[in-house]
């Protein structure tokens, strides 16, 4: 797995093994046919600190960015979907790539 490329990765998700919220967020992104870059901290523990640097200490898993904008976690991702905003965000980053 490569390090996050903040300039080109349209959708980024930081995850950890055994995290139900991480699985739910991945599932939603997959259902939306979003291409995303996943940073599993089990594969590279330094990604945990990188996530904290980007999202703030004490942030929970997962943490998600779309088009360089911090969305938050699984609850925020699903809220965007319920509000009808997620599809537009994903389409806009797809168009940029």
Please identify what each model-predicted range represents.
Residues 41-59, 85-92:
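Thioredoxin-like thiol-disulfide oxidoreductase module
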Residues 27-29, 52, 78-80:
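Short, glycine/charged-enriched secondary-structure capping and boundary segments
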Residues 2-5, 62, 78:
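Short secondary-structure boundary/capping segments
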Residues 66-96:
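Non-catalytic, surface beta->alpha helical segment in thiol-disulfide oxidoreductase systems
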Residues 2-37:
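Local sequence-structure signature of Cys/Sec-based thiol-disulfide redox active-site neighborhoods
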Residues 20, 46, 72:
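Short alpha-helical
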Residues 56-65, 75:
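Structural micro-motif
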């Amino acid at each position: 797995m490569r390090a996050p490329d903040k300039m080109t990765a349209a959708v980024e998700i930081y995850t950890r093994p055994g995290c139900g919220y991480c699985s739910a967020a991945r599932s939603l992104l997959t259902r939306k046919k979003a291409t995303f870059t996943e940073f599993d901290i089990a594969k590279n523990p330094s990604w945990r600190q990188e996530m904290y640097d980007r999202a703030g200490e004490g942030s929970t898993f997962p943490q998600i960015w779309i088009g360089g904008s911090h969305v938050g976690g699984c609850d925020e991702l699903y809220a965007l979907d319920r509000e009808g905003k997620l599809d537009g965000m994903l389409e806009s980053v797809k168009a940029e790539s």
